[in-house]
A protein has these predicted regions:
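Active-site-proximal alpha-helix that buttresses catalytic centers in soluble enzyme cores
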Residues: 1-71
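Short active-site segment of divalent metal-dependent hydrolases/proteases
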Residues: 11, 170-171
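Surface-exposed helix-capping loop/turn segments at secondary-structure junctions
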Residues: 36-39, 141-157
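Short glycine-rich phosphate-binding loop at a beta-alpha junction
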Residues: 39-45, 153, 161-164
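Conserved histidine-centered catalytic loops in small-molecule metabolism enzymes
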Residues: 39-69, 87-101, 106-109, 201-238
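Phosphate-handling substructures
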Residues: 61-144
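Acidic, low-complexity terminal tails and accessory targeting/binding regions
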Residues: 73-89, 149-161, 172-238
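Short basic (Lys/Arg) and small-residue
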Residues: 167
């Protein structure tokens, strides 16, 4: 199975929607996916994710199935911290060096919650439980049951191409869990762009277990092909 995780296009957060640029980015995505196709399309319940998925849905004549657990609003409640001036924002927006200092760089999956850089998460002990449950149920429905950190039992070998249109917050929180990487170390080094396409291969190994491998990360080549601005977060020319 190939799992495509796509961030929504250039957003308007209030009211929840896409900018004109975001709609053009979504149309560029549809042309990208028209080349090799998809078998299933899933999306967050939020409008900006569904609007990003809509052109691809129309081109491929596939319905958009909603995954409630992939809502960024839910993740926001679990993974935001206070910055100076009581400004609330994502924990992964800290200066990235903080995740690799004071011994935090030595912590792994078993003890990452001891990292000094994550202590301000309001319910640190339980912050991942909802996302873990949603991820595990989603992947098990697709034929891959989580057995341990980054290891999945192959219940039903699949060659399907599956897309989930979601969010920066959801992607940066979910991917380290799915891959079995300490989240604070992942946050220190990775980010995703508007309509960035990340691809994960679930190889159907003969011994019945698999570990998802990232074979492409936050790819935006579709923007170049359509002559759209090729920037990170509308700020950095790429």
């Amino acid at each position: 199975m190939l799992l495509f995780v796509i961030r929504h296009g250039d957003p308007i957060y209030d009211p929840d929607s896409l900018t004109p640029r975001g709609h053009l980015q979504a149309k560029a995505l549809a042309k990208r996916f028209a080349v090799h196709g998809l078998d299933r399309i899933y999306a967050s319940p939020l409008i900006r994710a569904q609007q990003t998925a809509q052109p691809t849905s129309e081109v491929l004549n596939l319905p958009i199935q909603i995954e409630e657990w992939a809502s960024e609003n839910l993740a926001w409640e679990e993974f935001t911290v206070k910055y100076s001036g009581d400004f609330l924002h994502w924990v992964f927006f800290r200066q990235n060096t903080e995740f690799r200092q004071n011994g935090d760089e030595l912590l792994g999956n078993g003890n990452w919650k001891d990292a000094k850089s994550v202590q301000e998460i309001k319910d640190l002990e339980n912050c991942y439980k909802r996302l873990e449950k949603g991820s595990d149920a989603f992947l098990e429905r697709l034929g891959y049951k989580r057995e341990s950190c980054g290891i999945y039992r192959i219940l039903k070998p699949s060659e399907e191409r599956v897309a989930l249109f979601c969010h920066q917050g959801v992607t940066l929180l979910w991917i380290p869990y799915m891959l079995g990487i300490p989240p604070h170390l992942f946050w220190s080094s990775f980010d995703v762009n508007h309509t960035g396409v990340s691809v994960f291969e679930f190889k159907n190994n003969p011994n019945g277990i698999t570990s998802p491998k990232c074979i492409s990360f936050s790819d935006n080549s579709h923007l170049l092909l359509e002559g759209l601005p090729y920037q990170f977060q509308n700020e950095i020319d790429l």
